[in-house]
Curated annotation (Swiss-Prot):
It comes from the Eukaryota. One of its GO terms (biological process) is rRNA transport. This is Thiosulfate sulfurtransferase. The gene is TST. Keywords: Mitochondrion, Repeat, RNA-binding, Transferase. GO terms for molecular function: 3-mercaptopyruvate sulfurtransferase activity; 5S rRNA binding; thiosulfate-cyanide sulfurtransferase activity. SMART domains: RHOD. Residues 143-158 are annotated as: Hinge. It is found in: Mitochondrion matrix. PANTHER family: THIOSULFATE SULFERTANSFERASE, THIOSULFATE SULFURTRANSFERASE. Residues 24-142, 172-284 form the Rhodanese domain. Monomer. Signal peptide: none annotated. The active site is at residue 244.
Length: 289
């Protein structure tokens, strides 16, 4: 079981050996899941210019529920299956996801969690991300890859997903612990969250996602992560749901807990962007006076 759980992260060394050995193909697919605010960086353009050999671009803007008023909500089973099938991913493919964020990893855990939410277990995040891949001198290319289409069957695992109604009910029942991965100022309500007044769900504990990464942008050790959860009095033997602003960085909490042997962390997909619009005022905790 430890080995199976350990696959949630792969090292740049492991992946570069797989690339050099020509293993990228039907059995191993590499996906760049980068997303940046459009005014800052163009993820697709950067991918075209430079990516891991054999990688495809996993577009989080495309692979989502476009009918939702909230950003980046989980797509339907059929949409996800069709989308990843076109990237050459079948149910037997080992998928490795990465992104090019300067932190090391930002959006990749969201893609990792999406695959898991749709029943795919063989999925890993590249530890250290593209930033460290380049820094360590591993190969990059501008060559587009043309993966042969594959058939992917998606089955949503509802235990990994929480809705607004479940999160509301939990404020009273406290059936599950809630960890919020946003920066402290947004959690406390002292700084604006991209135009939204900020704050948090009553009872939530704050563990900013960047605190799970080392200065170099790698995931902290399992011992360090376990200590972080202990310090916040989060019990990994009990139900846990992660939240953030739009369901992206919450997936860092799911990944961190997974590395500690807890694979069942749910993500509240709507997160603060939905909570802000739908929850009654007394359900929005803020330190702003």
């Amino acid at each position: 079981a430890a080995q199976a759980l350990g696959r949630a992260l792969v090292s740049a060394k492991w992946l570069s050996e797989a690339v050099r050995a020509g293993r990228v193909g039907a059995g191993l697919r590499v996906l760049d899941a980068s997303w940046y605010p459009p005014e800052e960086r163009d993820a697709r353009q950067e991918f075209k210019e430079r990516h891991i050999p054999g990688a495809s671009f996993f577009n989080i803007e495309e692979c989502r529920d476009k009918s939702s008023p909230y950003d980046f909500m989980l797509p339907s089973e059929a949409h996800f299956a069709d989308y990843v099938g076109r990237l050459g991913v079948s149910n037997d493919t080992h998928v490795v996801v990465y992104d090019g964020d300067e932190l090391g990893t930002f959006y990749a855990p969201r893609a990792w969690w999406m695959f898991r939410a749709f029943g795919h277990r063989e999925v890993s995040v590249l530890n250290g991300g593209f930033k460290n891949w380049v820094k360590e001198g591993h190969p990059v290319t501008a060559e587009p890859s043309q993966p042969a289409e594959a058939v992917f069957k998606a089955k949503l695992d509802k235990t990994l997903l929480k809705t607004f109604e479940q999160a509301m009910e939990n404020v009273g029942s406290k059936k599950f612990q809630v960890v919020d991965s946003r920066p402290a100022g947004r959690f406390q309500g002292t700084e604006l969250d991209q135009g939204l007044e900020s704050g948090h769900i009553p009872g939530a504990v704050n563990m900013p996602f960047s605190t799970f990464l080392t200065e170099s942008g790698h995931e902290k050790s399992i011992e360090e992560i376990q200590q972080m959860f202990r310090e916040k009095k989060v019990d990994l033997s009990k139900p846990l749901t992660a939240t953030c602003r739009k369901g992206v960085t919450a997936c860092h909490i799911a990944l961190a807990a997974y590395l500690c042997g807890k694979p069942d962390v749910a993500v509240y997909d709507g997160s603060w962007s939905e909570w802000f619009h739908r929850a009654p005022p007394q359900y929005k905790v803020t330190e702003l006076k």
